Amino acid sequence: TFITLHSDNLFISKQGYWSEISNIDIPDRQLLTNTLWKARSKISKLYNSIVPYVNDRRKFSIQKNHISIEFFTNYNVEITIEEKEFTFENWKDFPIYITGGWFEEYTYMQLKLLEDLGTIYDLRIGLEIGFKEKEKSNKPFRFDNLKNMFSDTYQELDITFTDGKKLYIVECKAGNIKSEYIMKLQNITKYFGGLKGQGILASCFPPSNKILKKKIFDSKNIKLVSGQYFNEELTNIF
């Protein structure tokens, strides 16, 4: 309700339930996610090599930084991380998962602990907002502005939840933080969450750039959780 209260001509086109994630119940998937968190520095160095395979799902084989990944034409996966071996069958979206989707799932898993405690509510992952144009009226519609802001006709929110009073929007970054990520999260949070909306920039690595740190610090509606103390920083928000 927080999203529809603060937005015009919007509808939820994808509910963002955990169970909607393809192959989410594959055995050992959560174990792999936790393992990737521990090896986040090493896996981040492989993203550029894997990204070309995300759209067409071609097979690939990569061995680097004590990580071995085999993705086959039948979508089976073999991955070894620091002597931990994992095998999966028919995981078509694995290239998306391994290039950053895993971090969204890791962040969700940490927040799920808070939801189970009753600290937060209505936790979603990958919720999508659709825009629909109303019939012509004298009041100008901001559809073009939205399209320019979000670069498409819909917006996917990595993770959303509420504490019962305001909407929280989490933007997850498995790689380095860039200035445009901060501006994007500020805009999305304000638009969908209103003046009380709170953005959380979740990152595997804390920003090293002083300007980026200052931009986040000066922001009134964004909090940063990152790096070694990620879980503690996330919990301390509440």
Region locations from a protein language model:
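Intrinsically disordered, low-complexity Ser/Thr/Pro/Gly-rich regulatory segments
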Residues: 1-238
